[in-house]
Design a protein with these regions (language model features):
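Glycine-rich ThDP/TPP pyrophosphate-binding loop and its adjacent helix/strand module
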Residues: 1-109, 280, 294, 298-339
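Thiamine diphosphate
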Residues: 105-339
Length: 339
């Protein structure tokens, strides 16, 4: 049980963060439905539903005794007499364990008709909007197509001998001006990772005003990467996020997920050097590039490299790297820049 490893009051924590919180019996269907209905009515803040559950609820062992709250039910499937006893205990037929009960079939058939009506209404609303706003509708369709945007890279003026993070800022400035559906983020380092090249051409997203295109994520690298994954899954926007390369370690689970899901998120990692100034050895990437390069060589489910990894040597190569990143709509891109 969680009480063996922590005594944190999760509900109080999230209420303090400004969330709506509902605590329920996670094994009670009626309470789950009631909580979901309440959550749909909450506006202006996120909702957390804490369902307190019993592991292996309803499961029985081979001897007929309870298997509930036993950690073995978490990592291994029930088998033999335990499987038979559990199916019987839950009201099913061990000889036909995957049957659909009549009341379930009736419920889903009814819901299917409700959803058809909802979809028809939504499609009608979308068509009416598209007919009234043909230019916006065409732009929306273009954005959701997922194809690479057209960019005039001749507008990107680079300075010789610039550090590649500064060269990246020049590229981001052009992207902010030419790609209206791009959103760039930084983990509290926009001035250092030079994502401020993008920010200077727009403004930050804030509560109540989403006209900007820059997401200030704060010191939350993993959260920032996950948000970018969510944007990519939603579609219609091109997400990019930046931080120091050494902090890519905090993002690694999300980067792996982006690679597994073949999502074209642009990861901007700067300060790839043994000499990164006054920050010292804690900010000097050593093993990080080897990890990312290994990920690049692993094939995804489409048979392609799971990630495009680019480490340009100078300002001109930085422009080419950004062009390749924007043209890559199949996988994540890792852009590694020097200080």
């Amino acid at each position: 049980e969680t009480k063996e490893v922590m005594n944190e009051d999760t509900a109080a924590k999230y209420r303090a963060l400004g969330w709506e919180v509902f605590e329920i019996n996670g094994n009670d269907v009626d309470q789950i439905r009631e909580a979901l209905d309440k959550a749909k009515k909450v506006e202006g803040k996120p909702t957390l539903i804490i369902g307190k559950c019993i592991m292996g609820k309803g499961a029985l062992k081979a001897d007929g005794s309870s298997y509930e709250a036993n950690c073995k039910t978490h990592g291994a499937p029930l088998g033999g007499d335990a499987f038979v006893n559990t199916i019987k205990h839950l009201g099913g037929d061990p000889e036909n364990p995957f049957q659909i009960f009549p009341e379930v079939k009736e419920l889903y058939a009814k819901r299917a008709e409700e959803l058809k009506a909802i979809c028809a209404e939504r499609y009608a609303e979308e068509k009416a909007w598209a007919d009234a706003n043909p230019e916006k509708a065409a732009q929306q369709a273009d954005w959701f197509s997922g194809k690479a945007p057209k960019i005039d890279w001749s507008k990107c003026v680079q300075k010789d001998n610039d550090a590649t993070r500064s060269a990246s800022a020049a590229c981001l400035s052009v992207l902010a001006q030419q790609v209206p559906n791009m959103i760039c983020a930084s983990a509290d380092l926009s001035n250092s990772d030079k994502t401020d090249g993008f920010l200077k051409q727009t403004k930050a997203l804030v509560k109540g005003d989403f006209s900007g295109a820059f997401f200030q994520a704060g010191v939350a690298e993993l959260t920032m990467a996950c948000c970018c994954i969510g944007m990519s899954l939603h579609g219609g926007v091109i997400p990019a996020c930046g931080t120091f390369f050494v902090f890519s370690d905090y993002m690694k689970p999300a980067v792996r997920m982006a690679a597994l899901m073949q999502l074209p998120v642009k990861f901007i990692w700067t300060h790839d050097a043994f000499r990164v100034g006054e920050d010292g050895p804690t900010h000097e990437p050593v093993e990080q590039e080897a990890q990312i390069r290994l990920m690049e060589k692993l094939k995804n489910h489409s048979g392609k490299n799971s990630c495009l990894v680019l480490r340009p040597a100078d300002a001109k190569e930085t422009t080419v790297a950004w062009a390749m990143a924007m043209e890559n709509t199949d996988t994540p891109t890792a852009l590694i820049f020097s200080r």
